Amino acid sequence: MKPSERRKARRLAVQAIYSWQLSGNNIADVEHEFLTEQSLDGVDVAYFRELFSGVATKKPQLDELIIPHLERPIDEVSPVEKAIVRLATYELTFRKDVPYKVAINEAIELAKAFGADESHKFVNGLLDKLVARK
């Protein structure tokens, strides 16, 4: 498996998490939609599934880790930033095989791709605080 396959899986997972957060649809339905309606060329599908279902099923636990490092209520964080931070927090917490620097860098790249102009700074700062606490 190439690193780019995981990068593509993360990118697709952030989109699925974002969609799930906004729609409130069933996890299985959102996953099915993304697996059938998106191009999966070069995507580590198993990793996508793990990230998406992991974030969706462990959202309360992930938010408990994230909230102490926020300077505003989590409801005021943009849905894109929430999706990215939840995904990175999942990797940092449950995927010990992923070096923390890789998880943070990938999250920053996702924030640059999908977030507002300053999203990458917010994501980097929050994840740095989360890692420093561990």
UniProtKB/Swiss-Prot annotation:
Key words, A-Z: RNA-binding, Transcription, Transcription antitermination, Transcription regulation
Cited SUPFAM superfamilies: NusB-like
Domain of life per record: Bacteria
Cellular component, GO annotation: cytosol
Any one Gene Ontology BP term: transcription antitermination
CDD domains for this protein: Terminator_NusB
Transcription keyword on record: yes
GO molecular function, one term: RNA binding
Pfam family, one: NusB
Function: Involved in transcription antitermination. Required for transcription of ribosomal RNA (rRNA) genes. Binds specifically to the boxA antiterminator sequence of the ribosomal RNA (rrn) operons.
Family listed: Belongs to the NusB family.
Protein name: Transcription antitermination protein NusB
Species this protein is from: Shewanella sp. (strain W3-18-1)
